Amino acid sequence: MSDAHGVARDQLRAFIERIERLEEEKKTIADDIKDVYGEAKGMGFDTKILKKVVALRKKDEQERMEEEAILDTYLHALGMIESPPEG
């Protein structure tokens, strides 16, 4: 095997090992997050709502407002909410 192939093999192995380490860290973090949700649930918090709040906080205000407007439009079309009063 040429030296170039050996270098490529070593680089590939290094990438794979880094990915494996990061995947393990990701699993550890996911387990930690699950534990926090469990702790919050034990204190009486609704974990579904907590997850929604976390997701909303990731979005900027404009994006949230656009999504809420579209949701309202869909709910209105399905008769699930009334039209907002026109002023």
UniProtKB/Swiss-Prot annotation:
<dbReference type="Pfam" id="PF10073">
    <property type="entry name" value="GapR_DNA-bd"/>
</dbReference>
<dbReference type="InterPro" id="IPR018753">
    <property type="entry name" value="GapR-like"/>
</dbReference>
<dbReference type="InterPro" id="IPR046367">
    <property type="entry name" value="GapR-like_DNA-bd"/>
</dbReference>
<comment type="similarity">
    <text>Belongs to the UPF0335 family.</text>
</comment>
<dbReference type="GO" id="GO:0003677">
    <property type="term" value="F:DNA binding"/>
</dbReference>
<protein>
    <recommendedName>
        <fullName>UPF0335 protein RHECIAT_CH0003797</fullName>
    </recommendedName>
</protein>
